């Protein structure tokens, strides 16, 4: 009987989990992304078909040239959404009818009618620390298949990596204090709010105000009251009292609706009345440093030494760093618009570049040359390694795919960073919980030299002699 009850409980749990997964799929597929391509992807791919290139195997690298905010590195995010997209990408009758109206030939539309991505995708792990000019993802596929992925892949990686990187910067500035994502209302649309909340958790935020994101991605929710709650009552004390009576385990009171210190007095009165020692007060305006010092003093004098002070109000890593340097007594930060929009540097510049083609089984390197030397690409299908001494990352190595590795000194070890995550129409990468991804990112950050965290140092990317020579020769024509 005990065994039967256990099995029933397990079945109920699995059913509930499946329902959540189906709801996520439903929400994320209500809007069709099949045609989320820059128009030239279709003009080029029709041309590939006409010129006999449709089945030519191509290799594309995705990489970025500089990290946001002058940083030394970024956080890789968005892989799961990319694999979902690639696995399900097809073109239905409605898509084909639209393309027909745009003048595309029937032969090309017939090709698209039977489209399914059959290539391979190599990627770093989601949540990984990534550096400029290194391939973070490699697409190996027929020319048409590879080209049609470009826009969605860049759109996804550029947004989610940007937000994860920004969150990581803010979390590091908070020096162990809780950072909560409060940005939904300032995001650039609903999807940006959802994906941004997910990316922020990967970057180290502990919770989100975004209820739908919490439901879809299994995130911790955060949020208690706005000024409207206080204004709804005849006086502030009654507002606080009513709230704590309803939510005694979530007693965070916003004290700056009228006067911060009168609000604090009312909060202390209510906490005492209900015997709450571990509540919190939130301030959303004014001189946060000065206010926090005075609030902390009054809370301590009232015997509420475990009561937390939460601050919000257009915060980012720079303002948080200044607050803490000036001795602010703040226990946690609610960060909204400057996180969810990456306000200080709102562009993440991943690019998608052809680096090789395969003809009759031979791989031929390709290069894009520019008078701006930093825009000249690194050619060929490549492998990427990170070299460690103990648990500390020393440098990365980039080499041609078939090069023989040189032996390292016994105190060093290599880790290959690019692994196959999609092959033969199927994903090989299992989705991971946000908690798992956040812990991985935290471990990645702990492997970095302290100087990289504040961009006082740069991280070395070593090209193998053969790769360096190849790039030089191709650059010179």
Q: What does each model-identified segment do?
A:
Residues 222, 281, 309, 331-333:
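Hydrophobic residues within beta-strands of alpha/beta enzymes
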Residues 84-86, 123-126, 130:
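An N-terminal, globular interaction/scaffold subdomain
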Residues 18-56, 66-68, 103, 109-118, ...:
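Buried, small/hydrophobic-residue-enriched core segments of structured protein domains
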Residues 101-109, 189, 366, 399-402:
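Short, positively charged
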Residues 58-113:
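N-terminal, Lys/Arg-enriched amphipathic/low-complexity engagement segments
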Residues 22-56, 60, 70-74, 300-302, ...:
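Gly/Ser/Thr/Ala-enriched C-terminal appendages of enzymes
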Residues 4-6, 14:
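Short hydrophobic targeting helices and cationic amphipathic motifs
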């Amino acid at each position: 009987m005990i065994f039967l009850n256990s099995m029933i409980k397990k079945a109920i749990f699995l059913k509930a989990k499946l329902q959540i997964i189906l709801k996520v799929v439903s929400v994320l597929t209500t809007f069709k992304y099949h045609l989320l391509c820059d128009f030239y992807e279709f003009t080029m791919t029709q041309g590939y078909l006409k010129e006999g290139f449709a089945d030519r195997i191509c290799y594309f690298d995705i990489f970025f040239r500089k990290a946001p905010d002058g940083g030394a590195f970024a956080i890789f995010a968005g892989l799961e959404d990319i694999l979902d997209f690639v696995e399900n990408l097809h073109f239905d009758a409605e898509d084909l009818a639209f393309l027909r109206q745009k003048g595309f030939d029937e032969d090309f539309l017939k090709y698209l009618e039977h489209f399914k991505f059959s290539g391979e995708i190599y990627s770093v792990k989601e949540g990984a620390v990534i550096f400029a000019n290194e391939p973070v993802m490699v697409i190996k596929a027929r020319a048409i298949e590879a080209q049609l992925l470009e826009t969605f892949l860049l759109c996804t990686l550029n947004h989610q990596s940007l937000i994860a990187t920004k969150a990581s910067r803010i979390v590091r500035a908070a020096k162990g204090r809780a950072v909560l994502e409060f940005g939904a209302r300032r995001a650039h649309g609903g999807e940006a709010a959802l994906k941004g909340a997910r990316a922020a958790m990967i970057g180290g935020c502990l919770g989100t105000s975004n209820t739908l994101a919490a439901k879809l991605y299994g995130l911790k929710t955060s949020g208690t009251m706005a000024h409207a709650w206080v204004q709804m009552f005849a006086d502030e004390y009654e507002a606080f009292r009513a709230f704590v009576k309803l939510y005694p385990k979530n007693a965070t009171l916003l004290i700056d609706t009228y006067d911060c210190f009168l609000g604090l007095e009312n909060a202390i009165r209510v906490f005492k009345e209900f015997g709450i020692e571990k509540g919190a007060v939130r301030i959303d305006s004014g001189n946060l440093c000065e206010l926090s010092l005075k609030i902390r003093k009054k809370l301590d004098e009232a015997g509420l030494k475990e009561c937390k002070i939460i601050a919000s109000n257009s915060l980012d890593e720079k303002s948080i760093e200044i607050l803490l340097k000036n001795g602010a007594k703040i226990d946690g930060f609610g960060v909204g618009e400057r996180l969810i929009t990456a306000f200080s540097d709102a562009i993440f510049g991943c690019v998608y570049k052809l680096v090789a083609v395969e003809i009759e089984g031979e791989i031929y390197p390709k290069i894009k040359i520019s008078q701006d030397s930093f825009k000249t690409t690194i050619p060929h299908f490549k492998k990427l390694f990170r070299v460690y001494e103990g648990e500390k990352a020393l440098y990365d190595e980039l080499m041609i795919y078939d090069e023989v590795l040189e032996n390292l000194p016994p105190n060093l070890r290599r880790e290959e960073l690019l692994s196959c995550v999609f092959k033969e129409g199927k994903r090989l990468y299992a989705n991971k919980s946000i908690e798992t991804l956040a812990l991985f990112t935290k471990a990645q950050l702990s492997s970095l030299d302290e100087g990289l965290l504040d961009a006082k140092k740069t991280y070395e990317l070593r090209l193998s002699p053969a790769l360096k020579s190849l790039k030089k020769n191709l650059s010179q024509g």
